[in-house]
Regions:
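A glycine- and small/hydrophobic-rich beta-loop-beta segment
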Residues: 1-53, 57-61
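Internal helix-turn-beta structural module
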Residues: 53-152
Length: 152
């Protein structure tokens, strides 16, 4: 499930940054496949945004890494966006907007979370589908995505 995979990717990133994985930053980790989402709430969002939202809390401790999770077809769960980006500031930024990230995750409302943050990945429909990609960029110093993530 996407909500389990997000924290697992945060753990893999922590091990990379600590040097306990056999790799050292700077490095890029690439993952592919398609996770699942058990829909229990009324929210909107797809598996990539749910994965990113689930990674958000543990990612708070990762000052030198950023995660992008996106569908290669450009449409994550029928939302019109490909996915989302998470960095160490995402959790605090969402809380500062008056949102409860745990409630949003419970409501399957990851789309609203990343729309409010402005951290959705917008590609438009790509005309291809080679599953989902998770890209982790880990550096020797803090990594911060530039906004906008992609031109609209």
């Amino acid at each position: 499930p996407a909500r389990d995979l997000g924290p697992m990717l945060a753990q893999a990133s922590a091990e990379l940054l600590e040097g306990s994985s056999g790799l050292r930053p700077p490095a890029v980790l690439l993952f592919g496949g398609e996770s699942t989402v058990r829909i229990a709430g009324p929210g909107r969002g797809g598996r990539n945004q749910e994965l990113a939202l689930a990674a958000m809390k543990p990612w708070s401790a990762l000052k030198n890494a950023v995660l992008l999770s996106a569908g290669t077809d450009g449409d994550d769960g029928g939302t019109g966006v490909a996915g989302a980006v998470v960095d160490c500031h995402s959790w605090d930024r969402l809380c500062a907007l008056g949102e409860d990230p745990n409630r949003l995750l419970d409501d399957n409302d990851s789309g609203s979370a990343f729309e409010k943050l402005g951290d959705q990945v917008l590609t438009g429909i790509t005309g291809t589908n080679v599953m989902d990609l998770q890209i982790i960029v880990a550096g020797p110093k803090p990594v911060r995505p530039q906004r906008p993530l992609l031109p609209g």
